[in-house]
Amino acid sequence: MTKAHRDYHPAHFRRAEQRRLKAAPQTVKIPRSADHLELEFGNQQVKLTNLKKLFWPELKITKRDLIQYYADVSSVLLPHLKDRAMVMKRYPNGAAGDFFFMKQAPSPRPSWIDICAIEHGSGNIVNFPVIQDLPSLLWVINLGCIDLNQWYARCDDVDRPDYLHFDLDPVPGATFENVLETALAVREAVESLKMPCYAKTTGSKGVHIYVPIVRGPTQKQVWTIAKEIALVLASENPGLITAVYKVAKRPKGRVLVDYNQNAWGRTLASVYSVRPTPKATVSIPVTWEEIEKGIRIDDFRLDNVRKRIKKLGDLWKPLASERKRFQLEPYLK
């Protein structure tokens, strides 16, 4: 494949022919007594199945509870998913069960599900589902998806992302306190370049830091800049940070500033995603003041983050806005 081809992947946004009713409800309450249920949103019907199945048996959290959570946070979540291809990670037997990745939207499927058809290598076209509204969100979660993994670029130009980001992941021997220290170092580095940046817990072991950028540079160009920043951080903080991607060569007791997640076609768990962890933790936006004071991954769980969202709103709202995005073009070589 030539470099030019790598930087251009044809995509086609197939919007559903069936029009949605603008007045469709944006909230839903699922009865705890129901095991199977069909919800109607205007002219969209969503079938929910196996609602009583325990997805976290130790916590007594059911599939119904998971779907209800996503319904409750949909107003802050949906702007971050809209118009983006979704990679499905399905857990049919709950958080501790086996899972599998699924890119192709299953068929048959509701006629109102939008599709992002992306050409990969050798002309292979993958028809990804797109979560545009509450019904499509509930449909995807009902398939057994616990967390959500959307593309960094919107479907109308899948080669040009809206973000530059870093995945901070502790190498064995490093602590979460080391991750928080690394997050502050990343913040200092990107803010020295006048880049705005926002943090969230991964809900697993680390922290994600995102920089909203003006769409224009290709995914490869964004990856290159992220790599340069990560390498500088590692050289300036050798006892704390590593940017070595190969596991066998990676020094222990460091925090990996993973720039490689900026590669084309990669995804990270979205903001507000529940993670398949023993405590049903959530990838939640956090303030820099909270990072400075100290937080724990387990502070943010399916059972308690709704109160936080109600109080603080969407701390990541700027990531979904067209305003105050960083112009990366001057940094391209």
What is the predicted function of each stretch?
Residues Q45, A85-V87, D98, P196, ...:
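Beta-sheet entry/capping signal
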Residues H208-V214, V255-Y259:
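A short beta-strand motif that forms the metal-chelation/ATP-contact edge
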Residues M1-I61, D65-I67, L78, K82-D83, ...:
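C-terminal accessory nucleic-acid interaction domains of nucleic acid-metabolism proteins
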Residues P129-T202, I213-Q221:
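Signature for HUH/AEP ssDNA processing cores
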Residues L77-P92, D98-F100:
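Short N-terminal amphipathic alpha-helices
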Residues G97-W151:
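A contiguous, low-structure linker/loop signature
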Residues M88-Y91, C197-G203, V244-A248:
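Short beta-strand
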